[in-house]
């Protein structure tokens, strides 16, 4: 009888040490699957970061904004007709998350603060290539 109680106590101690909550991890994994909410959140986050930059730096035009993102993230940028192309993902460097919907949302929000309505095309994979174009009235 005494041996059974002792065994039971040790098993309880062992189980209590193994007990942890995976709620937060599972919640985050679930949220990463909801692309619409993730995009909306990324746009807001991009706008917050863009507003912070706008308050502190005077960036004159579209290419200045792109160049700033390039400098702060270390991602190379080149100009293309009507926009810019990043050879890498600038939003990944700022958000620390690699997901296309986050990349597009973040960049849309960031450029929006500076008054640019942009269209973001991201080809993410082993090496990301992100094209950001100024949206014209005909491309809406």
Swiss-Prot record:
What's the domain of life for this entry?
Archaea
Q: Please give the name of this protein.
A: Uncharacterized protein AF_0586
């Amino acid at each position: 009888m005494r041996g059974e109680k002792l065994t039971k106590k040790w098993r309880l101690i062992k189980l209590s040490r193994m007990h942890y909550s995976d709620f937060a991890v599972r919640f985050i994994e679930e949220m990463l699957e909801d692309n619409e909410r993730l995009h909306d959140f990324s746009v807001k986050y991009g706008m917050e970061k863009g507003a912070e930059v706008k308050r502190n730096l005077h960036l004159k035009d579209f290419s200045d904004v792109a160049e700033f993102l390039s400098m702060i993230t270390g991602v190379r940028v080149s100009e293309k007709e009507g926009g810019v192309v990043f050879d890498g993902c600038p939003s990944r460097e700022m958000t620390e998350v690699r997901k296309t919907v986050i990349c597009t949302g973040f960049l849309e929000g960031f450029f929006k603060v500076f008054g640019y309505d942009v269209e973001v095309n991201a080809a993410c994979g082993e090496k990301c290539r992100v094209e950001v174009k100024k949206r014209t009235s005909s491309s809406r």
